């Protein structure tokens, strides 16, 4: 009988000790992950773009400095009559940085815009039909060569996944971001 009680006691103590060790390991891993997050958090303010909810946040640490409803990539696919005329209109995901800020940006119409509008594609890059002012709003903040945060002609479409990949915001928010955001500030898009 005593042997049975000792066996039962060992069976109870051993799992408790294993659980205690597991909890200690979890606590250590939790501290390590929190430190990793702290190390990854930018020291400057940064932009976070949620493409699922179409929200743009300007943050500093845990504080939200500005929140704006935006429009992001539609995910739609377009194919032209040539095999290299294929596009998917997604907003790129990842970590970027504000590389350039432009007032009164010039939109250089890409080939896909001519195909979408059933227009003849200009042969020469210098063709005047490619250049349009006012389409991108008053400002543009580039985070990649062909991708930017810019304005919109139709603020009613904010909050929708409707763009060709850029991030559109309303006029007041765009002016705030242009005046506030500095070159090099991180942009996180998911």
Placement of each model-derived feature along the sequence:
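N-terminal pre-domains immediately preceding structured catalytic cores
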Residues: 2-190
């Amino acid at each position: 009988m005593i042997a049975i009680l000792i066996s039962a006691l060992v069976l109870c103590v051993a799992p408790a000790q294993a659980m205690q060790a597991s909890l200690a390991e979890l606590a250590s891993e939790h501290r390590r992950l929190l430190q990793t997050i702290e190390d990854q958090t930018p020291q400057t303010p940064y932009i976070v773009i949620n493409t699922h909810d179409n929200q743009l946040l300007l943050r500093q640490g845990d504080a939200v400095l500005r929140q704006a409803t935006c429009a992001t990539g539609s995910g739609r696919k377009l194919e032209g009559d040539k095999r290299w005329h294929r596009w998917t209109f997604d907003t790129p995901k990842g970590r970027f940085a504000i590389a350039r800020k432009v007032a009164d940006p010039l939109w250089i119409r890409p080939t896909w815009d001519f195909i979408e509008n059933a227009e003849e594609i200009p042969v020469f890059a210098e063709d005047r039909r490619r250049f349009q002012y006012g389409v991108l709003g008053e400002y543009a903040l580039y985070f990649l060569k062909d991708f930017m945060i810019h304005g919109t002609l139709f603020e009613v479409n904010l909050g929708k996944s409707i763009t060709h990949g850029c991030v559109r915001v309303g006029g007041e928010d765009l002016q705030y971001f242009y005046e506030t955001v500095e070159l090099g500030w991180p942009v996180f898009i998911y």
